[in-house]
Amino acid sequence: MRVLVVDESAERAEVLRDGLRRAGYEVSASLSSPLALLKTIDELQPDVIVIDTDSPSRDVLEHLVVMSERGPRPVVMFASDGAPEVIREAVRAGVSAYVVDGLDAARVKAIIDVAVARFEDFQRLRSELAEANLKLAERKLVERAKGILMKTRGLGEESAYALLRKSAMDRKLRIAEVARQLVDAANLLGA
């Protein structure tokens, strides 16, 4: 597993890199400033990002938000600042594990394992939510299309659905796509 290390302190970064290597991780790069974070992530495509900081700066959190939108990955943050609002901001920015009060090289592997597991669970939940929202939107679209057919053709609900389904099968499209086309056409015609 490739790890990108971000730490403004060269001494702490060396301790962290050493702990990661001993735990079996490949340290792909080490940054002393978060300014090149996005560029480095794009170039190296690390599996995990480990950030060691006294308190996460606004710049670091903004970079993490952008990274999460582009290509989310687990982020572990070791910080001295344990203020609840700082932790909440870090988690909202995409931090998978926020560890307060110092870096212990012996615990790094366990912390990264937990962060990766939490990240994977969160990604699975996010995917399931997106799928559920899509199905709900498609169901609403089919209901609108049925309503249009019922109104314009004088059909019952079952007949309207059967007509949508037949049209979808004849055109080798999903029923939601046929419904979308019908709703779009009705909107265009003002029906």
Feature locations, PLM:
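C-terminal output helix
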Residues: 85, 103-112
